A protein has these predicted regions:
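Alpha-helical scaffold elements adjacent to nucleotide-binding pockets in ATP/GTP-utilizing enzyme cores
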Residues: 3, 31-35, 61-69, 93-101
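Conserved Switch II/interswitch segment of TRAFAC-class P-loop GTPases
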Residues: 1-2, 9-32, 37-60
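Short hydrophobic alpha-helical segments of the AMP-binding
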Residues: 8, 36, 70, 270
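Short, ordered loop/turn segments at secondary-structure junctions
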Residues: 19-23, 49-53, 85, 158-160, ...
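Conserved catalytic-core segments of large NTP-driven translation/proteostasis enzymes
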Residues: 68-211, 215-222, 227-229
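C-terminal effector modules of nucleic-acid-centric enzymes and ribosome-associated factors
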Residues: 53-58, 202-313
Length: 313
């Protein structure tokens, strides 16, 4: 679920894939559909996979299950496309539907640039000579604006520092040295698809996904790093992802929660809970705008389960 929320946060649309040979919905179906509604994914297609392993009667029964399950969601009137991924059956129809039913939004390139970091890495091979080393790379999707080669960028919350036992996070300033998108070098990058940004950062900072969850923008334009958040909370009636539907109780003070904000994942402790408002102290800070939505998960049994979302006040 953490992976799904992080990736879906930067998407313009989604494919909701179900298997024709099992009953719909499964626990994961409910969880993913609620998550999609929560983060505002409106452009959806339903893909009915594995039609090659069921007969016509079962395929039609599964179609009716899907129609019933999607009532009241953004997928209620979405096309349901039967496919066999293994045999590549109807893939041309699916590609056509993606092009026709998930429109590319009009982008305003004049607004402050934002990129959510999904990956970060060191591209230098072991044994590379010092003079041949290149800076660290951050990868992700540009949410708004555009980035150009030569831009001075800021990365928040940045890296963890420990000065005299006091732990803090320090934002990073870097310069864009290279941009790659669509498998080739580009001079500027805009929203749509994934982009790799080569920087002059020490590669030890970016290696092994060290900057995943950060936000990149032009220096001086990013929102404040938040160590505590006050949230307007909207809880689901039932927790999702469990085999048995479990009623969601109100959030309590001193309760641990896991929060997803864009591609950032952090844990926190509720320091105050009242009515539909919760104040949470975060173990790792996030960089997010007021009004941003944050997914909330609670430990139920042995797993963290999605229970609702909050809007940053």
């Amino acid at each position: 679920m953490v992976t799904m929320l992080s990736g879906a946060a930067i998407m313009d649309g989604s494919l909701f894939v179900v298997s024709a040979n099992v009953k719909t919905p499964q626990a994961q179906d409910r969880e993913h559909m609620l998550a999609a509604q929560m983060i505002g994914l409106r452009n959806m297609l339903v893909v009915q996979n594995k039609i090659d392993v069921v007969d016509r009667t079962r395929a039609k029964a599964n179609y009716e299950e899907i129609k019933e399950f999607t009532k009241g969601t953004s997928a209620e009137n979405a096309p349901i496309i039967p496919v066999s991924a293994q045999h590549k059956l109807n893939m041309d129809v699916l590609i056509w539907a993606i092009q026709e039913k998930i429109p590319t939004p009009k982008r305003d390139q004049s607004i402050d640039s934002r990129m959510s970091v999904l990956r970060s890495f060191d591209v230098n091979r072991p044994g590379t000579q010092v003079e041949e080393l290149v800076g660290g790379v951050v990868g992700g999707s540009i949410v708004q604006g555009l980035f150009k080669k030569g831009d001075e960028i800021e990365i928040r919350p940045g890296i963890k520092t420990d000065t005299g036992g006091k732990v803090a996070y320090e934002s990073l300033i870097a310069r864009v040295g290279a941009l790659q998108a669509g498998g080739g070098d580009v001079k500027q990058a805009t929203p749509g698809g994934l982009v790799a940004v080569g920087t002059d950062l020490d590669p030890s900072v970016t290696k092994s996904d060290g900057l995943v969850g950060n936000v990149v923008g032009r220096a001086g334009t990013l929102p404040t790093t938040l160590e505590k958040v006050s949230l307007d909370v909207d809880l689901f009636e039932k927790a999702v992802g469990t085999e048995q539907l479990v009623a969601v109780q109100k959030i309590r003070s001193n309760e641990p929660l896991v929060l997803n904000a864009g591609t950032a994942v952090t844990s926190g402790i509720v320091i105050s809970a009242r009515e539909d408002i919760a104040d949470v102290s975060l173990k790792k800070p996030i960089c997010a705008e007021v009004g941003s939505k944050v997914a909330l998960s609670r430990r139920i049994g042995e797993s963290w389960r999605l229970i609702g979302f909050g809007t940053i006040r």
